[in-house]
From Swiss-Prot:
The lineage of its organism: Bacteria, Bacillati, Actinomycetota, Actinomycetes, Mycobacteriales. HAMAP family: Ribosomal_uL30_B. Part of the 50S ribosomal subunit. GO terms for molecular function: structural constituent of ribosome. It comes from Mycobacterium marinum (strain ATCC BAA-535 / M). Coiled coil: none annotated. One of its GO terms (cellular component) is cytosolic large ribosomal subunit. InterPro entries: Ribo_uL30_ferredoxin-like_sf (IPR036919), Ribosomal_uL30_bac-type (IPR005996), Ribosomal_uL30_CS (IPR018038), Ribosomal_uL30_ferredoxin-like (IPR016082). This is Large ribosomal subunit protein uL30. GO terms for biological process: translation. Belongs to the universal ribosomal protein uL30 family. The keyword Ribosomal protein applies. The keyword Thylakoid does not apply. Keywords: Ribonucleoprotein, Ribosomal protein.
């Protein structure tokens, strides 16, 4: 693959207690399970839409070299 895809590092920083069902499901779809959990996802329209729904619960930053800073 010659094209490098942009990726985002997404970290859940707030709890889902009191959050609406759609917000909880959006976090699950992103792969976030708990506070301080970080995932790396491709930067595309679908991911951006999910982030928009939960923007107050997460922090988003560009991923460095496609890694989330954690060994997997």
């Amino acid at each position: 693959m010659s094209e490098a895809t942009n990726q985002l590092k997404i970290t859940q920083v707030r709890s889902t207690i009191g959050a609406r069902w759609k917000q909880r499901e959006s976090l699950r779809t992103l792969g976030l399970r708990r506070i301080r959990h970080t995932v790396v996802r491709d930067d595309n329209a679908q991911t951006r839409g999910l982030i928009a729904v939960v923007r107050h619960l997460v922090e988003v930053e560009p991923a460095q070299n496609g890694t989330g800073g954690k060994a997997q």
